[in-house]
Amino acid sequence: MIGAGPAALAIADSLCDRGLSVAALAPADPAAPWANTYGIWADEVDALGLAHLLAHRWSDTVSFFGPGGPAGSEPVRHGRDYGLFDKSALQRHWLERLGRGGLRWHRGEAAAIEHDAEASVVRTAAGEAITAALVVDASGHQPVFVRRGDDGPVAGQAAYGIVGRFSSPPIEPGRFVFMDYRADHLSEAERRSEPPTFLYAMDLGGGVFFVEETSLALAPAVPFSLLKQRLQRRLAQRGVAVLEALHEELCLFPMNPALPDPAQRVVGFGGAAAMVHPASGYLVGGLLRRAPDLADAIAAALAAGLRGENLSRAAWQGLWPASLRWKHAFFRFGLEKLMRFDEARLRHHFASFFSLPTAQWYGFLTNTLSPPELLAAMVRLYGLAPWDVRWGLMALQGREPALLARMLAGG
C-alpha cells in the first residue's frame, strides 16, 4: 500500500482487519499531522460507530440561497447534524489499529513498480525492493502509478479559508453554514460574469470561527487570490474584521476525473481512484464505507487463489462495481451542467435541491442512493425547479453529449 493519508490508512485498516499481511510505503512519517480539515454529515459517522472521533458537532445547520439583503437572507434549515473530524484523533485511531494489526511501515518514495504473472515489486528511490501480491496506490489525487482516462479538462474545487478570531461573529454563534451563496457584496456585473462562490463556515467555540470561500468546481479552478478577495469583501460587507488568523487553509482537489482503467495491475483507492464525489466534493465518508468492500474483494480473491491480473481485476470490480460506475458518470454529467450556471441560476438550483425530502438530498450528497433512487430524486428535482434551471438542465453544450453517452453506456 502506497501512502499515509486518510485513504491509505482506511484501506490498510480494512485489509489488516481481514487478517491479510500488509506493508505500507510512505515518503514521510505516517504520524505527521494532516493539513486539511475533514467535514462530514454526522449520520455517516454515527452509522459507523465513529462519532467519538468528531471534534465538533452542530445541530443548527443551514444554507443561504437568496440574493442577500434584508429580503433575501432567509436560511434553509437542513435538520441534519454536521461534524468536523478531530484530525489527530482519526489519524491516531487508524495508526493504533494498524499497529495491532501488524502493518509493516517502510519509509521511502516509490520509484517504479514491476509486475510478473504472480506478484509485483515496488522499488523505492533508495533501492529497496518490496514484493507483494497486489499494490494499492492511495497516494492522493495525483498518483504516479494509476492510469486514468483523459476526456477533457478536470475541474477543481478550490477554497481559501481562515480559522481565527473576528471583531464580531461572522456567522450566528453555534451554527454551521454549509453553503451561503448570497452575493450582495458583489456588483451586478460580477454576479453575471464571474464564477459563483459560496461561504462554508462554522463556529468552533471559544470565540474562534472557520470561514472559507469556496468554488464548487471550475476548469481551470478559481484562483486562491480571487477566493481570498471574495472572502474579505464578504466579511467587510457584514462589518466583520479579522482580529487574529490562527490558521490559513488553501484547498484544491480534482472533482471530476475520469475513472481509472480497471485493466491495470496497480489498484487505486481514494483520490488516486477518482473516489471524490463529482457533484459534492465529499471523500472521507466514501473512504469509510468503501474500504471494507475493496478489502473483502481482495481477501476473497486471494483466498480463491487469484494472482496477477486476475487479482487486480477482482479488486477493481470490488471498488467500482457497475452501479457505482454509472453513478459516477451521472454525477460528472450533472457537475458539467452546474459549472455552466451563473450565480442566480445556481442559487435557484440549490434552493430546489434542498427542498427535496431530506433522505433524497442527503443520499445524493453522500452517494448512498441506489441508481433507481437517484433517478427518482432527479425527476422530482426537475419538477421542483424553476424554468431557468430546467432550461439549463435540458440544453446540451460542450462535452455534455459525450458525458451523457458515457452515462447511458453504463459509465
Predicted regions and their residues:
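A conserved FAD-binding loop/helix module that cradles the flavin
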Residues: M275-L294
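A conserved beta-strand/loop capping segment in the N-terminal third of enzymes
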Residues: A42-E109, I113-E118
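C-terminal helical "tail/cap" subdomain of flavin- and related membrane-associated enzymes
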Residues: A295-G411
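FAD-binding beta-loop-beta segment adjacent to the flavin cofactor pocket
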Residues: L250-F269, P278, R325-A329, L338-A344
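Glycine-rich Rossmann-fold phosphate-binding loop(s) that bind the pyrophosphate
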Residues: G3-P6
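Predominantly flavin-linked oxidoreductase catalytic cores and closely associated redox partners
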Residues: S14, R97-V242, A258, P262, ...
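N-terminal FAD cofactor-binding segment of flavoenzymes
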Residues: A10-G68
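Flavin-binding catalytic cores
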Residues: A219-E249, V267, R289-L319
